Regions:
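Flexible coil/turn residues that form the inter-helical turn or adjacent wing/linker of helix-turn-helix
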Residues: 48-49, 54
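A short pre-motif secondary-structure segment
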Residues: 41-45
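Internal acidic/polar
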Residues: 1-20, 24
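Short helix-coil-helix linker/hinge
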Residues: 21, 31-38
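Short, locally clustered residues in the helix-turn-helix/winged-helix DNA-binding domain
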Residues: 31-32, 46, 78
Length: 88
């Protein structure tokens, strides 16, 4: 059985002029369920390691808006990931 372990296919996202590779296919699918803006914020925060203040400046939005959108996106990602786990 261990010889037939399926490997995830890395998926590339473009954000802030950079290519971000998400190695987990499940996470990538969950990210695709987010609005483009929320996905952008999550990728900038956790893959490009930008702070909320930096993201806010790039998007021309208040830091509080970025923080709210980030938290809402994380909650939505958690829900999507749980749905996928339940389907397995």
């Amino acid at each position: 059985d261990e010889y037939f372990i399926l490997q995830d296919k890395p998926i590339a996202f473009e954000v802030n002029g950079q290519t971000v590779i998400v190695d987990s296919e499940k996470l990538a699918k969950a990210l695709l369920c987010l609005s483009e803006r929320r996905r952008e914020i999550i990728l900038m925060r956790y893959y490009l390691q930008l702070r909320d203040r930096q993201i806010a400046a790039l998007l021309g939005k208040p830091r509080t808006t970025v923080n709210y959108q980030k938290n809402a996106a994380l909650k939505q990602l958690r829900t999507e990931m749980e749905k996928m786990n339940d389907e397995e």
